[in-house]
Amino acid sequence: MKNVLPPFIEIYRALIATPSISATEESLDQSNASLITLLAGWFSDLGFNVEVQPVPGTRNKFNMLASTGHGAGGLLLTGHTDTVPFDDGRWTRDPFTLTEHDNKLYGLGTADMKGFFAFILDALRDVDVTKLKKPLYILATADEETSMAGARYFSETTALRPDCAIIGEPTSLQPIRAHKGHISNVVRVLGQSGHSSDPARGVNAIELMHDAIGHIMQLRDSLKTRYHYEAFTVPYPTLNLGHIHGGDASNRICACCELHMDIRPLPGMTLNDLNGLLNDALAPVSERWPGRLTVAELHPPIPGYECPPDHQLVEVVEKLLGTKTDVVNYCTEAPFMQTLCPTLVLGPGSINQAHQPDEYLETRFIKPTRELITQVVHHFCWH
């Protein structure tokens, strides 16, 4: 099988050279179809059955599932095909040209996280996948950097139930078994415009929002004292006020005001619970000013995630790597994969390079990542 695929570095180079930017702004958003076609071809060459799945509600985005083997269980290796947009003025290299310098591989997606697929392909090039005793699945998803639509759709529609899954996000090969969720909301206040010389003839939306923010701050303090998870560096749910806008002139009573905020819940906290807490916090304002305050989602929510610490996957990976699993504050697709099977987040490269100009992956990760993928495939698909 070894001559079927291009060399590792050429696979990497081709992945980086194929743009697949996800953005909420339509002018920046790109289809991942070309990248999916590349991956589908390579996994087909290795003997996998390949299914390409359009993702509803996206701008021409696709998931790809490559599978081999029969029966129940097995292993799912998964990652996203998209990258964030890049700031051309801050990059000193071409983001779409893989450049090796000073023991680093530079390019958009080298760490986050197109490179993971190059590692999978390279680790499997000498494996006769038709002889695996349990199924092996490779999932490439769309739109992780914006809506996570690909992972959401796959988890809602697939009948697959592997024994376990590994998401190859850049964790510096530190296995992650839990992370916080993310909920982003917009609070809107509708006032009544009027001339500032007669405040009684209007309803000032900024003043109502000031009242609302006071209640939101009380909720923030309550979250900090009521919920605790010691393993996290920030061991409580955080609440952040990120953006506010209201009014258009100093001599006009403000007619509308809008606040963008987010909450990062701990694993185990349900999205319904958090929505209820926010609505309860704002209830005094809503009752005093009926019909003038609304709360809506800015983006689809992401629940917190946790893999049981005593699961076989945790035990096996900790033994292979000689290190304990950890928890992180950022989000991945793990909550959606966890609905299918126990899931770890584990991959080459540093999260500190994600979304940064001159993104890179250190070459010191190449050998241990290849070895790790080989070992987990052997353990979960050969035994």
From Swiss-Prot:
InterPro entries: AcOrn-deacetyl (IPR010169), ArgE/DapE_CS (IPR001261), Bact_exopeptidase_dim_dom (IPR036264), Peptidase_M20 (IPR002933), Peptidase_M20_dimer (IPR011650), Peptidase_M20A (IPR050072). One of its GO terms (cellular component) is cytoplasm. Its main location: cytoplasm. It comes from the Bacteria. It is found in: Cytoplasm. Binds 2 Zn(2+) or Co(2+) ions per subunit. One of its GO terms (molecular function) is zinc ion binding. One of its GO terms (biological process) is L-arginine biosynthetic process. Its cofactor is Zn(2+); Co(2+); glutathione. Pfam families: M20_dimer, Peptidase_M20. Its EC number is 3.5.1.16. It catalyses: N(2)-acetyl-L-ornithine + H2O = L-ornithine + acetate. The active site is at D82, E144. The keyword Metal-binding applies. Pathway: Amino-acid biosynthesis; L-arginine biosynthesis; L-ornithine from N(2)-acetyl-L-ornithine (linear): step 1/1. Zn(2+) 2 binds at D112, E145, H355. Zn(2+) 1 binds at H80, D112, E169. It is an enzyme of class 3 (hydrolase). Keywords: Amino-acid biosynthesis, Arginine biosynthesis, Cobalt, Cytoplasm, Hydrolase, Metal-binding, Zinc. Catalyzes the hydrolysis of the amide bond of N(2)-acetylated L-amino acids. Cleaves the acetyl group from N-acetyl-L-ornithine to form L-ornithine, an intermediate in L-arginine biosynthesis pathway, and a branchpoint in the synthesis of polyamines. Belongs to the peptidase M20A family. ArgE subfamily. Homodimer. NCBIfam families: AcOrn-deacetyl (TIGR01892), PRK05111.1 (NF003474). This is Acetylornithine deacetylase.
